[in-house]
């Protein structure tokens, strides 16, 4: 079984140990800093003001025309599962959405798949 004791990540639809989380080198989030993020604190096993963080994160996604690919309820469920898998009671949880990878040779960000 995977070791999530250092943290868990949700990448491309699956949970992985934080040390195995990766994005392709051709992802525009990596190449061009075309991404957005927000960080929420977990204290004593509970998120601190998750609704406010999620609202701000989704507003940033909309402003930069980034599709998180999940509904707010689904994002919440993913974050909760990451904390549950890790067993960490005190932590920071980062929500990140990148532009993704465009088709090879394309410069059109609308064609990128994240």
Regions found by a protein language model. Name each.
Residues 1-114:
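Conserved alpha/beta cores of soluble small-molecule-handling proteins
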């Amino acid at each position: 079984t995977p070791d999530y004791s250092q943290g868990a990540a949700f990448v491309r639809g699956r949970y992985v140990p934080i040390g195995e989380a990766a994005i392709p080198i051709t992802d525009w989030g990596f190449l061009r800093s075309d991404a957005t993020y927000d960080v929420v604190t977990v204290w004593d096993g509970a998120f601190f003001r998750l609704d406010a963080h999620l609202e701000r994160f989704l507003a940033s996604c909309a402003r930069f025309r980034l599709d998180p690919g999940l509904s707010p309820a689904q994002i919440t469920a993913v974050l909760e599962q990451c904390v549950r898998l890790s067993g960490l009671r005190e932590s920071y949880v980062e929500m990140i959405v990148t532009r993704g990878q465009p088709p090879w040779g394309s410069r059109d960000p609308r064609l990128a798949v994240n």
